[in-house]
């Protein structure tokens, strides 16, 4: 599987998807992206942006899709049977996991491997564009 990424650009506060990611320069620690503008359904113009690694957040695709066929990325917030959960990478287990939002504030939050329940998930946002979903309702 070829890794697929999306990038949150802190400057400009915009999500860049892999189709618009032109280059990842590991030596200079920067990426080059494009924003394509369409007119009448056809590409009309584009802007090119360069971001330092310090100004972006990489999010890798899990390779899985939610119940509506939407690709699930690290950092996504999902609805799972009426509870919100956030998707994270667990380095020790080399696996994507989900943690319920209402457990994030606990000292020891429970987590589960993503592959066990992803087919019940519905992606409802992500930690950058919809951070309010990470707030615990009391």
PLM regions and their residue ranges:
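Secondary-structure transition motif
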Residues: 1-138
């Amino acid at each position: 599987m070829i890794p697929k990424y999306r990038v949150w650009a802190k400057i400009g506060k915009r999500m860049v998807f892999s189709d618009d990611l032109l280059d990842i320069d590991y030596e200079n620690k920067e990426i080059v992206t494009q924003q394509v503008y369409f007119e009448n359904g056809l590409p009309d113009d584009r802007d090119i942006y360069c971001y330092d690694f310090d100004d972006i957040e990489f999010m890798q695709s899990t390779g899985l899709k939610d119940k509506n066929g939407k690709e699930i990325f690290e950092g996504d917030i999902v609805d799972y049977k009426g509870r919100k959960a956030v998707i994270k990478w667990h380095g020790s287990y080399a696996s994507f996991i989900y943690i319920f939002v209402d457990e994030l504030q606990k000292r020891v939050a429970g987590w589960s491997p993503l592959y066990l329940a992803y087919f019940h998930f519905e992606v409802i946002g992500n930690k950058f564009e919809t951070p309010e979903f990470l707030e615990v309702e009391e």
